């Protein structure tokens, strides 16, 4: 069985195929995170969707302490090596090292903003990264038959509830977990509107609203 744990904002731990994958591990300074970076004792892969501080977070330090492989866009991978991270895989969109890098509509200074698809144990997880809505989400859903989609809903910097609900319609996951909300005052403070829209329009999709620190086995 695979399991996803939410640390608040866009930070997740995915346990799948006997691997621990951390995504966007912004823990120290994250007002929603129930754990500190120093409490992460094991990780196999750390994936960072883009270089904004609320996503890159503690990734370098966690990789150096746990010997996890840092995976991100090429330019951000170069930065990781400069910071002393030993195991680095710098990829472009479409590239894969067991994780598939996907596009995201956002901004960043180093490399392209990305999402990621993780496969293992016959399960597939999609973390959309910080993104707006884009039509090729339909293609991702058709190609990868998603078990779980992790979707930003907070608005302002990413999709809001309406666009995120449409993303769910395009992706057609079995389950969706909302993220990237409530952390800052400018973001949506609740997932209620998103939950209502998905349940009304895609009733077959399971909406899983986690509290920080909670896990979803699948």
Where are these regions (language model features)?
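Glycine/small-residue-rich loop that forms an oxyanion/phosphate-binding "nest" at active or ligand-binding sites
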Residues: 49, 57-107
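Binuclear metal-ion centers of metallo-dependent hydrolases, dominated by the metallo-beta-lactamase
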Residues: 81-96, 163-165, 169-218
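Active-site neighborhood of phospho(di)ester-bond hydrolases with catalytic His/Asp-centered motifs
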Residues: 22-24, 43-51, 70-74, 125-131, ...
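Pre-active-site segment of Zn-dependent metallo-hydrolases
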Residues: 13-52, 57-64, 75, 105-109, ...
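Active-site environment of divalent metal-dependent phosphoester hydrolases
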Residues: 29-30, 52-57, 77-80, 95-98, ...
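Active-site-proximal loop/helix segments of hydrolase catalytic cores
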Residues: 105-170, 193
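Zn-dependent metallo-beta-lactamase
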Residues: 1-20, 27-30, 193-205, 209-214
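Active-site-proximal beta-strand elements of phosphoester/diester hydrolases
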Residues: 3-6, 21-24, 99-104, 124-130
């Amino acid at each position: 069985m695979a399991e996803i744990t939410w640390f608040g904002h866009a930070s997740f731990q995915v346990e799948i195929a006997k691997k621990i994958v951390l995504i966007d591990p912004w823990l120290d300074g994250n007002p929603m995170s129930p754990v500190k970076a120093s409490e992460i004792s094991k990780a196999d892969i750390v994936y960072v969707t883009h270089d904004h501080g609320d996503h890159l977070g503690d990734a370098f330090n966690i990789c150096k302490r746990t010997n996890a492989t840092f995976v991100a866009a090429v330019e951000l991978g170069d930065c990781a090596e400069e910071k002393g991270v030993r195991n680095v895989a710098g990829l472009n969109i479409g590239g894969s090292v067991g994780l598939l890098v996907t596009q995201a509509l956002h901004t960043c200074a180093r490399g392209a903003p990305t999402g990621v698809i993780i496969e293992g144990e016959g399960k597939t997880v999609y973390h959309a990264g910080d993104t707006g809505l884009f039509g090729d989400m339909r293609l991702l859903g058709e190609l990868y038959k998603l078990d779980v989609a992790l979707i930003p809903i907070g608005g302002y910097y990413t999709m809001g509830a309406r666009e995120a609900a449409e993303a769910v319609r395009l992706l057609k996951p079995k389950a969706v977990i909302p993220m990237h909300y409530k952390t800052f005052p400018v973001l949506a403070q609740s997932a209620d509107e998103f939950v209502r829209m998905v349940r009304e329009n895609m009733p077959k999709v399971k909406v899983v609203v986690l509290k920080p620190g909670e896990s979803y086995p699948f």
